[in-house]
Each structure stands twice: as structure tokens, then as C-alpha cells.
Amino acid sequence: MPESKYRQQTIRAPRGTVLTAKSWLTEAPLRMLMNNLDPDVAENPHELVVYGGIGRAARNWECYDAIVDALTRLEADETLLIQSGKPVGVFKTHDNAPRVLIANSNLVPHWATWEHFNELDAKGLAMYGQMTAGSWIYIGSQGIVQGTYETFVEAGRQHYNGTLAGRWVLTAGLGGMGGAQPLAATLAGACSLTIECQQSRIDFRLRTRYVDEQAATLDDALARITRYTREGKAVSVALCANAADILPELVNRGVRPDLVTDQTSAHDPLHGYLPSGWRWEEYQKNAQSDPHGTMQAAKRSMAAHVRAMLAFSQMGVPTFDYGNNIRQMAKEMGVENAFDFPGFVPAYIRPLFCRGIGPFRWVALSGDPQDIYKTDAKVKEIVAEDKHLHHWLDMARERIHFQGLPARICWVGLEWRQKLGLAFNEMVRCGEVSAPIVIGRDHLDSGSVASPNRETEAMRDGSDAVSDWPLLNALLNTASGATWVSLHHGGGVGMGFSQHAGMVIVCDGTDEAAARIRRVLHNDPATGVMRHADAGYDLAVECAVEQGLNLPMVAATQGKG
């Protein structure tokens, strides 16, 4: 690995109200960049890796230093441009423009392959930004806990009469994203068995209470699951092993889970999925010396993994892809029916997207957990009738360990995001919280992503691969005055399979911030309602009408009806 991608340095975001930069609008991206590399947050901070295989916050350490320096000196009417983790320019704009514009991992479609990206990465010309790694709004595994929880709850509604009590989930992967699964299953009332090939990841999840127990062997794991499901207890169990070995063995034994999914880093066969029979150190070494052979070995193991998932599905076990592109990898290795089980979005989440409901998150720049608890109470006050959301917030406070700066996520839609943002801004203005709040989201949202094997799989009108929508989302958030806006390629499912956009806005208590919040936190989720209404989803059309969206072609269609 080039020396510039490794540095033995501990990064933590500043806390409190003393500014390092010239304003909160530049202090916020500075702190969030640093927070992404906090050792309590990032998977491999010394190599700038935040999560998701090689999802980085900056291209190399020289670029990181230059970004920090640029943000520290950035004026209130300037915008910093980031190209794949490298600061390439500072331009005069205006005080309502974004302070940072980010483009990560974007390639011309014909060249949008892992092979070409890896060549560029080796030359120091590109960086994989994943979704929230390179856009500086990762908050640790909490960032995906509620989405996973909502998925499991909906699966319980659809398949098990509304409850997962006495049921168990079989899955794999305890990295930055997959680490949310055991806690989400527990919160949804289910037991879970999660296979993870790296002991260090299991140790981290045990320490942060995302996993309850570790089993010594497969027999031990199954005995624990049998006991806990019989007793109606929701306990999460981890097993250090390779999913490509364990799932076929479970099929051979005739073991029948109640739900099956997967969140290994299968999207990145060179760095994220350990081939069967290999040690992790061997995998890393071979990735450097024989990348093609390593990728093929990983994909062969993925094929075995998916064949086992297909076998569970054929038994009648609800089985779904959780968005890591493992079905595609298996299909490329000859598993022609790899897509016989669905992805999680068309199976469970799309009705939420139709109403602009998605992963709304916020972070207390003060570093004070009390600021988050106060905002939790404000959410309950404003969204007073949503008891499901209140239950989530109560469970989150009890069970979720803050990683880095205190943060919260809750899935809310078009109707509420603007109201919550304005309320948080008012809390900052009147001193109810001790420092500004930043509001952002995952790129996995209703209007900000095109990903035919994940968020836009099986769209009603066949527009799965149309990527105009995330581009429009990024452009609109820029025009609306988000504090920083990002446009990425390849997040979640790997090179060539997705394009997606993100935004973050600062609540600093000023009237100017309130005006920006009104625009951004309405327009951003509204693009999701627009996208789904355009695709012909009645629920989205109804939401658009209720919220007064001006969608010319949808209005014309409604008029004809």
C-alpha cells in the first residue's frame, strides 16, 4: 500500500463551541470529516477506510491534510471542490451556496468496472467513497440500524402475523453496515445468528452491544438459537466462520431459519469477501499479488453462498438480498437463477420510499449526548402521533452506543423533515442545545439513488437503471443551499451498479439557516416522492397531491383520469 494511505495517527473531531474554522458552516464539514476517521467510528482509520471494504474519507493522508487546511481557511462565500477525496479547488460563490461540493468514484459508464477503478486507485487517481464515507456523514452502525429494523419488522408483518417473537434470522457480515443486523433483529423481537470471518469485528460488536453473545462452534450456535427461540428471547449470536462454508452446511443439515439475508461486503470481491478456505491475511496479500485470481476465488465462494440462500428460499424460508450485490456476483459465476429471491427494497421498503420516508440523521457537533436526548424529545413532541417512531427512539436511547460524535437516525418522510430541521435550528438559536446540529442522510433514500440491484430494483415502469434522478437530486440540493452536497458512484453494490447523491445541512440557529432548511429539507425528500410518482406508484402520487408538489406530467396524468 502506498505510504500516503497509511498513517499511525488518531483523529477525533473537536467538541464544544470553540471554532477551528471561520464559521459553523465550515466547522461542520471539518468535524464530520474527522468524525468519520474517529477510531470508534471507522473500520480502519489509519488507512482512511471508514466502512464498506475500501470506502474512504479522503484519497490519501496528504489529501486529508489539504482538506483540513482548506476548510480551516474557507470563507463564507467560497466553495471547496473535492474530486474523489482530493481537494482540487476553492472558488468564490455566495453565502447561500454549498461550502463543499464532492464527487467521488464517478467513471464514464463503459469504464465503470472494478478492474479499471482499481487501476486508477493504484495510480492515486481515484477513491472509493462508498455512500457516507466520502461524503463525511457516517455515524457508525446506527446509521443503518433503523432501516434494518424496519425491514425485519415488515418481514414479520408479511410472513409471521406481525411478530418475530420466537423466530430467528440467519445472516452474515459484521462490518460497518452488517454490524447493524444483530441489534436490529433483537429490537424487532427476533433471535439472530450472524456469521463473520474476522474475530476483531465480532469483538467490536460485542463491546458496543450490537451483538449479545459469541458461539464457539456451529453446534453451539444452533443450540443457543434453539434455546432462545423456545424461550421467546431475542438474543443475537455471532459465529466466527465463513458464510460460504456455514450456509451450505446448514442446508445439508436441514436447518430451517425464519428469515435469511446477508450483509457481507460482497460488492467488493477484491477487498470485502473472504474466499472459502483462505485466511484474511492471505486474502489481503493475494489481493495485491493476484487481483484477478483473488476476485474469482471470492466470487466462487459467493456463488456457493447464494446457492445456499436459494435452497433456503426453495424451502419456503423468506430470503432476501440486503443490497450488497451478492446475487449479481453469483450470476456472473454461473448461478443463473441468483435473482429468484428479491432485494429488500421491493420486498419491504418501497412503500416508505413512495412517501419520501427514509434515513433522516443528525449529529450534535458539541459532542454532548444530552443534545441528542433533547432532540429525541423534540421529535416525539412534533411527530406526536407516530408511536412506532417513539418506540424506535426509546429503544435507540437504551441500546445504541454512540460512536464518535453523538448522533441519531430515524426514518421520517416529506411531511416531517423540514419541520424537524426548523425545530432543531430554533433549539440552537435559543440555547436549548449547546452547539449547532448537522442534518444529513444515507444516500440510500427515496430520490437520491439509482441502483437496479438494490434501491431501484423492479421499478414499476422499468426505469431501474435511469440515473437522471440522483443527478437531479444533487443539483436541486445545491440550488437549495445545502451545506455540502455529494455525488458518488458504486456505493453499496460496487462499480458499475449504482449512482447516488447525498446532502448535509447545518442548523446554526440563524435566520439564514432556517431559510436554507426550509428549501433543502422539503426539496430533498420531495424528489423521492417525485421519482416514485413518475414511475407510477399510486402511493407516491397521493403523497404528492397531499403535500402540494408541482409535478407537471403527474398532474396531467391525474387530470386525464
Curated annotation (Swiss-Prot):
Cofactor: NAD(+)
Gene: hutU
Reported function: Catalyzes the conversion of urocanate to 4-imidazolone-5-propionate.
MF (Gene Ontology): urocanate hydratase activity
Disulfide bridge positions per record: none
Active site residues per record: C410
One BP term from GO: L-histidine catabolic process to glutamate and formamide
Cofactor: binding comment: Binds 1 NAD(+) per subunit.
Name used for this protein in its record: Urocanate hydratase
Main location (coarse class): cytoplasm
